[in-house]
Amino acid sequence: HARERLDDLYRPYLDGENVSRYKLTWNGEYVKYGENLAAPRDKEIFEKPRILVRQIPSKSAYAVEAVYTDSDVINDLNSMVITDIQVNPFYLLGILNSRLISLWFFMKFDKFQRRLFPQFKVNELGDFPIPYAMDSQQEEIAKLVEQLMEEMKKDSPDTDIVHQLNLKIDDLVMDLFDLKEEEKQIVRNFVV
């Protein structure tokens, strides 16, 4: 690790704490990425559009912390990488970051009852239910997600805008799962 880019092999480095819901931060560290590493991962996963999912979930109604990036950055093993995205990536991001998926995650894996630092694994991520959606439905969620990501980039995001966008995304996700109004209310009231 280095605090400055010493040559072209040094690339921005992210650890798990740099990955949060809809926002990617960077603490100014670089890593020399190449043959010098004992077990380098395929560098292509760091060069293409992808979703990073933090391995340690938040203990909140929005437990899953995922963000989209197409930047040339290296992430550590505390973030899982989704590169084989078969749908609109912002749609997928909205599903993963939704309150409904957090509730499902909480009930399915019971992570917060067992350990101080709960983690979820790649195979568990593969179990996440991703509903079928027509292109127009994907686009509707994707546009809201992109608005939310833009708001989150600001030094001081407007909490009312963030809250309203989260609610809209959550409602659209619940619609895709055909939840009844009573079921939607259970999801809306979910807290950890």
Where are the regions a protein language model picked out?
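Non-catalytic DNA-recognition/assembly elements of restriction-modification systems
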Residues: 9, 17, 130-192
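Polybasic, glycine- and aromatic-enriched phosphate-binding surface used to engage nucleic acids
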Residues: 1-138
